[in-house]
Amino acid sequence: MSVLSSRTGRDRQRYDNNFRLVSGCIPYRLMKADETEEDSGVDFVNKLEVLMVSSPNRHDLVFPKGGWEDDETVLEAASREAIEEAGVKGILRELPLGVWEFRSKSSTVEDECLGGCKGYMFALKVTEELEDWPERKNRERRWLTVKEALELCRYEWMQRALEEFLRVMEDERRLRTEEETVHDSSKLEEESQIDPWYCFVVN
């Protein structure tokens, strides 16, 4: 039996210009590379996995998300949904991947009259997977490659969020690689005892 419980009802639901505000995340992990493998861009994408969960009473897959309530920040809401729906904890990036307007297939008549939903999505680096979580009986979780997730993702707006997630992750990897190259070059210069007056960096 789960110690935690999911929030229910919409008494504390936030709205913005008739849009129901939703917060969610893309939980991810990076599989460890084989020491003999080169760290190419293709290898990086293949090692990147995202966690999806099934919808209640259906077999389609989605990312954890739910209503953003008035007693929590948008980041707290995303973290809460990750625990409630997927049973994962981790490091949530403060900068959202984006904000998407959509109409949920499970929307109530009230939502349809108001104007649908506005979803904030974040990237969550998973550090812990819980064996038991609030919605374990109603949801299955699956680790997938980004390519698999794009094919199985039910909603178009979530596909766009996943594409943005991949772009951000690839940009960060590229930046890290460039920084490591600069660091290695600097170390080599020091070991070669090159006069620093003859060294310069082009930005």
Curated annotation (Swiss-Prot):
Keyword Mitochondrion on entry: yes
Motif (Nudix box): 66-87
Tissue: Expressed in roots, leaves, stems and inflorescences.
Entry's Gene Ontology molecular function annotations: metal ion binding; pyrophosphatase activity
Binding site for Mg(2+): 81, 85
One GO CC term, this protein: mitochondrion
Location of this chain's protein in the cell: Mitochondrion
Enzyme class, spelled out: hydrolase
Main localization (coarse): mitochondrion
UniProt cofactor(s): Mg(2+); Mn(2+)
EC number: 3.6.1.-
Transit peptide among keywords: yes
Keywords recorded for this protein, A-Z: Hydrolase, Magnesium, Manganese, Metal-binding, Mitochondrion, Transit peptide
Residue span, Nudix hydrolase domain: 18-166
Family designation: Belongs to the Nudix hydrolase family.
PANTHER family reported for this sequence: DIPHOSPHOINOSITOL POLYPHOSPHATE PHOSPHOHYDROLASE (PTHR12629), NUDIX HYDROLASE 12, MITOCHONDRIAL (PTHR12629:SF58)
Function according to Swiss-Prot or TrEMBL: Probably mediates the hydrolysis of some nucleoside diphosphate derivatives.
Name of the protein this chain belongs to: Nudix hydrolase 12, mitochondrial
Native species: Arabidopsis thaliana (Mouse-ear cress)
